[in-house]
From Swiss-Prot:
Converts heme B (protoheme IX) to heme O by substitution of the vinyl group on carbon 2 of heme B porphyrin ring with a hydroxyethyl farnesyl side group. One of its GO terms (cellular component) is plasma membrane. It is found in: Cell inner membrane. Pathway: Porphyrin-containing compound metabolism; heme O biosynthesis; heme O from protoheme: step 1/1. The chain crosses the membrane at residues 24-44, 45-65, 94-114, 117-137, 144-164, 171-191, 216-236, 240-260, 272-292. CDD domains: PT_UbiA_Cox10. This is Protoheme IX farnesyltransferase. The keyword GTP-binding does not apply. It comes from the Bacteria. Keywords: Cell inner membrane, Cell membrane, Heme biosynthesis, Membrane, Transferase, Transmembrane, Transmembrane helix. It catalyses: heme b + (2E,6E)-farnesyl diphosphate + H2O = Fe(II)-heme o + diphosphate. One of its GO terms (biological process) is heme O biosynthetic process. The gene is ctaB.
Length: 295
């Protein structure tokens, strides 16, 4: 009996954890770390930890509310039908309450423990993801990812503001890198999930304009992304080292973009999507490494 109860509790905890979209949350926190490390000045380690926890909670809040709102279309898509809400493991009301609570807590704690600017940016990122992307753009325009991608680009600015209590052109450049990365990343996924998106009536770029035009735009955005990724060298301590890392990773990114335009198959698009995740991690790892003095 006790074993059964424990298993049910564990299963419930895991389902609420899945509401947070943890894979996205890890990337969000990592890019926030990059913003903190590149910022001038210093921050007490405990406050830095609090800041990152708030960023994680804010990201999870947006993810949970997104799953609450999208529960109807999630049920129609193979990729999402087993999520906690459409599968019936978590009620829609519980998910919404969970998401709102996390969002309020994250912004409140950030404001009280860290500073108001970082808290305001965190609030804007949550609200942008929920209201601008999820509720307004996602089901209405093929530019949903292009504009909505701004929501996921805020974490480096939040990290920077947590340290400096300000917003600067340097943090905006980090924002811009993620903003330019988002379209080719998600379009590569949507090319392989066209039937899912069509079934759910989501006007992804490839559904509205076709796969061939989407592949061309992936290449265009990939080139723009790689060019944008060179800009952090303007303020990093190890600028030349960073440039070499960014150019190397960027050339591979463009190679994958050319591959999907050339081969036009599921495998090349899957490889592009997978590499895009590794690319962003490696790029921001390079930013972190080239911001610190090890010797």
């Amino acid at each position: 009996m006790y074993t059964s109860v424990l298993l049910n509790v564990e299963s419930t905890i895991l389902d609420f954890w899945r509401l947070l979209k943890p894979r996205i949350m890890y990337l969000v926190v990592f890019t926030a770390v990059a913003g903190m490390v590149t910022a001038p000045g210093s921050m007490h380690p405990f406050l830095a930890l609090i800041s990152l926890i708030c960023v994680a909670l804010g990201s999870g809040s947006a993810g949970a509310i997104n799953m609450w709102y999208d529960r109807d279309i999630d049920l129609l898509m193979e990729r999402t039908k087993n999520r906690p809400i459409p599968s019936g493991r978590v009620s829609a009301e519980s998910a919404l309450e969970f998401g709102i609570t996390l969002g309020i807590l994250s912004v409140f704690i950030m404001a009280i423990a860290v500073n108001y600017i970082s808290a305001a940016l965190l609030a804007v990122s949550i609200l942008f993801y929920v209201f601008i992307y999820t509720i307004w753009l996602k089901r209405r325009t093929p530019q949903n990812i292009v504009i909505g991608g701004a929501a996921g680009a805020f974490p480096p600015m939040i990290g920077w503001a947590a340290v400096t209590n300000s917003v600067s052109w340097e943090s905006f450049i980090l924002f811009l890198v993620i903003f330019m990365w988002t379209p080719p990343h998600f379009w590569a996924l949507s090319l392989n999930k066209s039937e899912d998106y069509a079934k759910a009536s989501i006007p992804m770029f490839n559904i509205v304009y076709g796969p061939e035009k989407t592949r061309k735009y992936i290449l265009i955005y990939s080139v723009l992304l790689v060019l944008t990724s060179l800009l952090p060298a303007l303020f990093l301590k190890k600028a030349l080292l960073y440039l070499s890392m960014a150019i190397f990773a960027g050339c591979i990114f463009i190679w994958y973009a050319i591959s999907i335009l050339r081969f036009k198959n599921h495998n090349s698009q899957k490889q592009m999507f997978s590499y895009s995740i590794s690319y962003l991690f490696s790029l921001f790892a390079s930013i972190i490494f080239c911001s610190i003095d090890l010797f």
